[in-house]
Structure formats: structure tokens, C-alpha cells
Amino acid sequence: LPEIINWAINLKNDNEMSDGFKPLEGMTIGSIYEKPSTRTRVSFEVGVNKLGGQPLTLLSNDIQLGKSESVSDTAAVLSRYLDGITYRCFKHSDVKLLAENASVPVINALSDMHHPCQAAADLMAITENKNDLNGHISWVGDGNNVLHDLLLAGVILGHDVKYATPEGMEPNQEVVDRAIEIGKETGAKIIATNDPVEAVSDAGVIYTDIFVSMG
């Protein structure tokens, strides 16, 4: 992850490198959206295009996924036409099933459990603006998919993450336990509280979110 973020920052800031780097040339990347999307859809389409590929957007009403065709059948069919698939879905089990049955790479563009590309983009922004982060990353909001991957990505990069969630809206404990285990290797800590004031005290970065998911 650190290498990907540093590479992305260099690509963003080096116009000559960006103009000449076309690893997706001749490839078509399909993006399936069960949920409406603004930033995710635009960023994937622009990104694939800039890297030389052809983006193909498939909305839920455009295909038979989950209707007359199963996720596994859809994965097999799309793999014959596409060089990669991104999938923004409701159930995390569906993106796992798609990945298991596809013969091309599959990227989770959002599920109810994870939002990895969002976390990578957030950590990239933090690295760009606070490379010498003095203090922990603070989260105030519900324990949703974005927090799950902020916990994982934050400790991978060696940052302590302290989060405040309302009682009964805590993150998935398996994800928290996984982040704690990763933190033991990187020296980063996960700290939980229900008090937002405590969470933001002495923070280097404060990340807030709504209590009702936008999807």
C-alpha cells in the first residue's frame, strides 16, 4: 500500500510520466454499479481512460445480474469480454463471489463491509498534506465500511487510529481485530471510544462521517 500511494502521488504530480504511462492500453475495464455513484464512477472512468484503457459502465438496470443471471454466471460471461471488473454492490458476499468466479482481476468499488479504494484515496491525501503526521488519525461517525478500511490502511502505514462511534454502531469486531494484529507488526495502535471529544484530542487528522449511510 505505501508503494501504491507514493507511486500515485508521483503519477499525479508528473505530467510527463502521466502522459506516457498507459498500462491499460488496449484493455476494457467494466464497472458494475448496483448503487448510484458520483465520485467512484467518475474517478474510475477518468482513471481508466488516462491509463489508456476503455471504461465500460454497467448499471444495475443494464444487465441481468441478480435477476435472470447469477453473480457467478455474470462473472464468467464478463471475463470473456473484459480485462478487469470493478463492482459497487450492496452485499460483500457478492463481490467475493464475483471475484471467485471471474478469470480477470476484480476490484471492490464499495460493499457493505469494505470500501478499499476510498481508504487508499484518503491515505493518499493525508500523505500528501501531512506526510510528517504528528498525532493519530481520528474518526468520528458510525462504524461503517469506510471506517473498516481506514483502520486497516491506517495501521498498514504505521498510523495510530482512534475512532469514536455511537453505542451500538461500532465497527465489525473481526475487522478491528485484524487491524490490531497488523498494528502489532507496524507499531500502530487502534483505540476505541464513544466520546468524539476524546477521539479528536491531539489528533493529527480528523475524519468525520454521517450517521446514515449514503451508500
For each predicted feature, which ranges?
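Active-site cofactor/substrate anionic-group-binding motifs, chiefly glycine-
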Residues: 28-81
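Positively charged, low-complexity intrinsically disordered leader regions
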Residues: 1-42, 46, 114
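Short, acidic/turn-prone active-site loops that include or flank metal/cofactor-
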Residues: 61-63, 110-115, 166-169
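Glycine-rich phosphate/diphosphate-binding loop of Rossmann-like nucleotide-binding domains
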Residues: 34-46, 129-208, 214
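Anion-binding alpha/beta catalytic cores of soluble intermediary-metabolism enzymes, centered on
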Residues: 75-76, 83-153
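A short, aliphatic-rich alpha-helical micro-motif
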Residues: 79, 99, 199-201
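Short glycine-rich, flexible loops that bind phosphorylated cofactors or substrates
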Residues: 93-94, 213-215
